[in-house]
Amino acid sequence: MHSLATAAPVPAALAQVDREKIYQWINELSSPDTRENALLELSKKRESVPDLAPMLWHSFGTIAALLQEIVNIYPSINPPTLTAHQSNRVCNALALLQCVASHPETRSAFLAAHIPLFLYPFLHTVSKTRPFEYLRLTSLGVIGALVKTDEQEVINFLLTTEIIPLCLRIMESGSELSKTVATFILQKILLDDTGLAYICQTYERFSHVAMILGKMVLQLSKEPSARLLKHVVRCYLRLSDNPRAREALRQCLPDQLKDTTFAQVLKDDTTTKRWLAQLVKNLQEGQVTDPRGIPLPPQ
């Protein structure tokens, strides 16, 4: 373990005086009296300090302090009494953990320490109040930052946890923003070959995913969101790469994806339109047509 002063080379863009402030705030995380302000300042600066993640990870007591912030609000989850102030404070701690999760030098250690599991109680919450919604969204952001790296070790880790059912529940009943991030996480898991195989391994897993995606399509036909629809279509398209899932989707793909329901929403989105066309094509291929022009399922 090295001292903060030698944690990393100084980026040219960051003035020395700012570096000193960063070191000071990191040291202040260790003390409960100075932690709240340090969390706020560091979370504001995290985008402009490229090596903040290694500094947080390797400095004495810092990760323990961030985990303490998380554990401290567990009692406010059930019964749900979380205040806006509590939510803002813990979300600043989560923002710093997201920084650690997405940095190539600290990601593996972050996973090896099973730190994402500390966030799962927040994803289990169902209260619709703003403090809880913000808490769920920020927690999803940490997992989203992990999957965005497209690293095999991330998917392997997540598949050993309950992240898929947690995401599916949020996809069904969260706010539009939370649904979007949760669907993005599922999409990233599906795009990995191991993730696709895992979800299609049993009928129960596949049917749970297909059921939630189907409900989302129905909801989107009433309250359209191009961004959310894009992720839903990509999930369906990826599922159609698996032969067994493709067979099942021929029966259960929502009609709204086969007719003109979303034509207006997607009129300027060439990527999603292409994915949708490919999905329909994938489901048609391999079907035998009888003389009356009716597609027959393969024998």
From Swiss-Prot:
<keyword id="KW-0539">Nucleus</keyword>
<keyword id="KW-0678">Repressor</keyword>
<dbReference type="GO" id="GO:0030015">
    <property type="term" value="C:CCR4-NOT core complex"/>
</dbReference>
<dbReference type="Pfam" id="PF04078">
    <property type="entry name" value="Rcd1"/>
</dbReference>
<keyword id="KW-0810">Translation regulation</keyword>
<dbReference type="GO" id="GO:0003713">
    <property type="term" value="F:transcription coactivator activity"/>
</dbReference>
<keyword id="KW-0010">Activator</keyword>
<keyword id="KW-0943">RNA-mediated gene silencing</keyword>
<keyword id="KW-0805">Transcription regulation</keyword>
<keyword id="KW-0804">Transcription</keyword>
<dbReference type="GO" id="GO:0030014">
    <property type="term" value="C:CCR4-NOT complex"/>
</dbReference>
<dbReference type="GO" id="GO:0033147">
    <property type="term" value="P:negative regulation of intracellular estrogen receptor signaling pathway"/>
</dbReference>
<comment type="subunit">
    <text>Homodimer. Component of the CCR4-NOT complex.</text>
</comment>
<dbReference type="GO" id="GO:0006402">
    <property type="term" value="P:mRNA catabolic process"/>
</dbReference>
<dbReference type="GO" id="GO:0017148">
    <property type="term" value="P:negative regulation of translation"/>
</dbReference>
<dbReference type="InterPro" id="IPR011989">
    <property type="entry name" value="ARM-like"/>
</dbReference>
<dbReference type="GO" id="GO:0000932">
    <property type="term" value="C:P-body"/>
</dbReference>
<dbReference type="GO" id="GO:0005634">
    <property type="term" value="C:nucleus"/>
</dbReference>
<dbReference type="GO" id="GO:0031047">
    <property type="term" value="P:regulatory ncRNA-mediated gene silencing"/>
</dbReference>
<dbReference type="InterPro" id="IPR016024">
    <property type="entry name" value="ARM-type_fold"/>
</dbReference>
<keyword id="KW-0963">Cytoplasm</keyword>
<protein>
    <recommendedName>
        <fullName>CCR4-NOT transcription complex subunit 9</fullName>
    </recommendedName>
</protein>
<dbReference type="InterPro" id="IPR007216">
    <property type="entry name" value="CNOT9"/>
</dbReference>
<comment type="function">
    <text>Component of the CCR4-NOT complex which is one of the major cellular mRNA deadenylases and is linked to various cellular processes including bulk mRNA degradation, miRNA-mediated repression, translational repression during translational initiation and general transcription regulation. Additional complex functions may be a consequence of its influence on mRNA expression. Involved in down-regulation of MYB- and JUN-dependent transcription. Enhances ligand-dependent transcriptional activity of nuclear hormone receptors. May play a role in cell differentiation.</text>
</comment>
<comment type="similarity">
    <text>Belongs to the CNOT9 family.</text>
</comment>
